[in-house]
Amino acid sequence: KISEEMQIRTVWDEVQEKWYFCINDVIAALTDSKDPAEYFKKIRRRDSELDDFVRGTNCPPHQFIATDGKRHSAKCMDLQSLLRLVQAIPSKKAEPFKRWLAQVGAERIQQMQDPELGIQQSLMDYKRLGYSDNWINQRLKSIEICIYI
């Protein structure tokens, strides 16, 4: 949910075990386009790699209940595909997401260079999610044991 007036429909795919996001909703949230489907077609024409990516099985349709109460099919993307789409959108509304992607990418590369940073990030994430210090310590110990097995 982006705001009270703009929502991105999502669906959990039990088979793939991942979230899918409605492409038209994402485009509507990140652009001023009146026709998100047409905007998506234009982006695909401009970005051949994105078009090739979309032509595969990366954008399966999913059923959503519309405001009229009927079920409608909409093309969706998984998280990785969604992040690729955000990179292709030349809109000021997409810039905060692009900066966030750059920040997360830089942090991940730093964690690969210094694994201790990854452990520290895990600690902060577990605390942010509300886990107790005891639970966090047990979790980190179990991860350490799994690494040595």
Could you say what each language-model-derived stretch is?
Residues 1-149:
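An anion-engaging/catalytic patch
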